[in-house]
Each structure stands twice: as structure tokens, then as C-alpha cells.
């Protein structure tokens, strides 16, 4: 374990300055790319979590100062490319944006932009640089409120483009506006809490209360609609229901009284309900005992399967566009599940998945000199995209935890 931790730390320290980029075209501010192999690109949740990871390695004031303009610039570049409707491209390069959300008919950036902004503010101990951008943050959240919110109180993906967990069966190839994704809703809950905290620090007290209340309402909706008492797990829900027609005699005697249907597909993102602090303690206990620890569902020697081994859609293969989220081990799902376990006091299990991740990545660095994008849950072999960095760098935060050291938190 110590050998692997040292190999990983050496590798990250050698690579971290290679992810800094100078202003270019549509990216007018200095910025961080999600890995050294990226030329001039920012991606929504990749950039956020890469920043969290790299920040953990900055141990001196000199290093922090050197990175600070790149951290702020990453957020500012997203906001500078906001469309008139308030959506933000999920990816922007120096030359173009890769997104069709301007039309309102396709997904834009996921709700992580505000969280990224809050992270940078807290890491640098400075909110002042964000004051002039505050209206844009509000506009971004209002876009989701206006275009992506269902009558149930849950939010939905417009389509299956760039959802982050590319081919999650709950959204992939599903009809437009039908997926009340647990992944999306947990991110949105944290996004609203982040906006509340930013509002408070900038002196917008009414907004602070507004966003707190919006977060509370969303939490209640997630608990009501997404937790399944039978299986003890949080799921995405199907919103693709026909409207109630009380004029039709064959339905009018007892029309539907529900506005969502749980899609009981075991996807790792159910654990984001723990990461976000949405699950109750008793729900978390069931999630861990009845789901996480089951080797025929999520549990493996190398971390958490991204899709249950028992699902018909389970598949381990190399693919791109979409990348495969149908079971392989990903660094980001291991990390966020690690944080979820810590939040609810499952410290031994958190330690275990951290050790599994360090061993998995350490062996990869030892054998290949770098990381892969995702891994086989049965063998630990890298499957795709050798040289991938991005959120895999969060293993640094896990190493700090295992060493009993403080670590940066998203």
C-alpha cells in the first residue's frame, strides 16, 4: 500500500503543472484542463473534480498562489460562455462550444458550476472575485428551474447527451424529459446548497434563505419519489407518463394517483443520496447492508461496480462516446462512494474502498506508468483510454485520508 501511494503521489506531482493552460479563443481566462492529454478544453464535472484533486496536492502558499488564477479562470470561462437562456455548454474549447442547450432541446452543463465556484472561494479564502458573476450563477440555476423541473419537484435531463454517466440505462436512449435521474437531482441539491452559501457570504440574505428553501424542497421530493422501501435503495424515476384524462370513461373511475415511477435499476449513483446527505441514517444502513456489500450487485475487489452485476444491461467493454458505465470501476464513483460512506460513519468501509482504489491505481502506474479511464471489476485490469487523469487524481485525497491528513473536499 505504501509503495503504491508513493508511486501515485510522485506521478501526480510530476503531472499537475501539465494541466494548466493559458487563455485561448473562447476561453479568455487561464484555466485547468481535466488531464495533461487535453489541449484546450473544459468539461463541467471533470474540471470541477480535477480542481478538487489538484488542490489537495498544493502544500505551500507559493503553489496555491501559482494555481489560483487558473482555478478562478476555470469557473469564469464557463460563465463567460453562458447562452442567453442561462444554460452553459458542458464543454468548451478554445475554438468552439460542444453543446446544443441554447435551443432548450438538449442538455447543457450539469449543476456543478456553482459548486465549483464555491470550492474555489473557500479554498482561496476569497469570495470577492465572484461578486460580479453572481447574477450569472442565478441565471444558470433559473435555467434549470424553468426548463428542467417536473411537477413532482424533481429535475430531469432533457435528453441523453453528455449526462456524465454516459450510458446509464435510466437515461440512455430514453425519451426526452423522461429521466428524473438520481445523479442529476443529488447534484442539483448540492448546487442549491452551494448557492445558498455563496449568497450568504456575498451578503444576499434573502437569496440565502431562498436557495436553502429550494434545497429543502428538493430533498423532500427526492426522499418521497426516489427511495424504494422494498429494495432499500435510491433510484432514478421515470417521468414519461400520459396526462390524466378524466373525460375518458375507461380511466375516470380510478385515474393514476402517482406522477413518477421508480426505475429499479441498480446504478452506483444511488449512493449520491448519501454523498449529498439526503438519505436518512436508517436508509443509509439499508443501502449499505442490502446493496453496497452484495457482491452480486455492487461490491468488488477493486471498488464499486457502476451498474449491478445482476442487471441484464451489465457489460464490461472498451468504448468511447459513450464511455462504458455499465459495470466497470471508475475512479470518480469509487471516490464519491468513499465520501458517502464517511458521511454516514462507515469509516471501515470508507477506508477499505480507499485502499482498493490506491492499490488499483498504484498497480496501473507501476505497470503502465499512468492511469486508465475505467477498469474491469473482476481483474482490476485497465480497460480504456490509457493516460486518463481527470477525477482519477482524487486518489490523492484518499491517500491523505489514509495517512490521517486533512484533504480538500468538494
Roles of regions detected by a PLM:
Residues 2-18, 62, 66, 73-78, ...:
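Active-site acid/base region of carbohydrate-active enzymes
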Residues 40-155, 182-185, 189, 267, ...:
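Aromatic-rich carbohydrate-recognition surfaces in CAZymes
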Residues 1-40, 127-129, 138-143, 199-200, ...:
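Acidic/polar, glycine-enriched structural segments that form the non-catalytic walls/loops
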Residues 289-298, 307-309, 322-323, 336-410:
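Non-catalytic C-terminal accessory modules of carbohydrate-active enzymes
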Residues 29-32, 86-104, 161-181, 247-255, ...:
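Acidic/His metal-coordination segments adjacent to aromatic residues that form catalytic metal sites
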Residues 71, 130, 208, 215, ...:
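Solenoid-repeat scaffolds in large eukaryotic assemblies
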Amino acid at each position: 500500500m505504501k509503495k503504491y501511494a508513493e508511486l501515485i503521489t510522485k506521478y501526480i506531482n510530476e503531472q499537475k503543472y501539465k494541466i494548466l493552460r493559458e487563455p485561448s479563443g473562447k476561453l479568455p481566462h487561464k484555466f485547468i484542463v481535466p488531464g495533461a492529454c487535453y489541449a484546450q478544453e473544459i468539461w463541467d464535472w471533470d474540471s470541477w473534480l480535477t480542481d478538487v484533486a489538484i488542490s489537495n496536492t498544493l502544500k505551500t502558499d507559493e503553489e496555491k498562489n501559482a494555481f489560483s488564477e487558473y482555478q478562478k479562470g476555470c469557473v469564469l470561462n464557463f460563465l463567460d460562455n453562458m447562452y442567453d437562456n442561462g444554460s452553459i455548454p458542458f464543454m468548451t474549447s478554445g475554438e468552439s462550444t460542444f453543446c446544443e442547450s441554447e435551443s432548450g432541446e438538449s442538455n447543457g452543463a450539469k449543476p456543478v458550476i456553482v459548486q465549483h465556484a464555491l470550492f474555489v472561494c473557500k479554498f482561496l479564502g476569497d469570495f470577492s472575485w465572484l461578486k460580479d458573476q453572481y447574477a450569472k450563477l442565478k441565471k444558470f440555476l433559473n435555467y434549470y428551474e424553468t426548463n428542467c423541473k417536473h411537477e413532482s419537484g424533481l429535475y430531469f435531463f432533457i435528453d441523453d447527451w453528455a449526462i456524465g454517466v454516459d450510458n446509464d440505462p435510466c437515461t440512455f436512449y430514453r425519451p426526452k424529459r423522461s429521466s428524473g435521474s438520481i445523479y442529476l437531482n443529488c447534484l442539483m441539491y448540492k448546487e442549491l446548497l452551494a448557492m445558498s452559501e455563496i449568497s450568504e457570504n456575498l451578503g444576499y440574505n434573502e437569496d440565502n434563505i431562498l436557495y436553502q428553501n429550494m434545497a429543502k424542497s428538493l430533498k423532500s421530493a427526492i426522499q418521497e419519489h426516489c427511495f424504494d422501501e422494498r429494495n432499500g435503495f435510491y433510484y432514478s424515476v421515470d417521468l414519461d407518463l400520459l396526462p390524466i384524462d378524466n373525460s375518458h370513461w375507461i380511466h375516470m373511475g380510478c385515474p393514476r394517483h402517482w406522477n413518477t415511477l421508480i426505475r429499479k435499476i441498480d446504478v452506483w449513483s444511488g449512493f449520491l443520496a448519501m454523498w449529498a446527505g439526503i438519505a436518512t441514517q436508517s436508509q443509509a444502513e439499508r443501502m449499505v447492508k442490502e446493496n453496497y456489500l452484495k457482491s452480486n450487485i455492487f461490491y468488488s475487489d477493486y471498488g464499486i461496480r457502476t451498474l449491478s452485476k445482476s442487471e441484464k444491461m451489465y457489460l464490461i467493454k472498451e468504448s468511447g462516446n459513450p464511455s462504458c458505465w455499465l459495470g466497470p470501476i471508475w475512479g470518480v464513483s469509487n471516490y464519491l462512494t468513499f465520501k458517502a460512506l464517511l458521511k454516514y460513519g462507515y469509516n471501515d468501509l470508507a477506508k477499505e474502498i480507499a485502499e482498493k482504489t490506491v492499490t488499483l491505481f498504484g498497480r496501473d502506474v507501476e505497470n503502465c506508468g499512468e492511469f486508465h479511464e475505467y477498469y474491469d471489476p473482476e481483474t482490476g485490469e485497465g480497460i480504456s483510454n490509457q493516460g486518463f487523469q481527470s477525477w482519477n487524481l482524487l486518489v490523492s485525497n484518499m491517500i491523505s485520508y489514509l495517512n490521517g491528513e486533512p484533504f480538500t473536499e468538494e
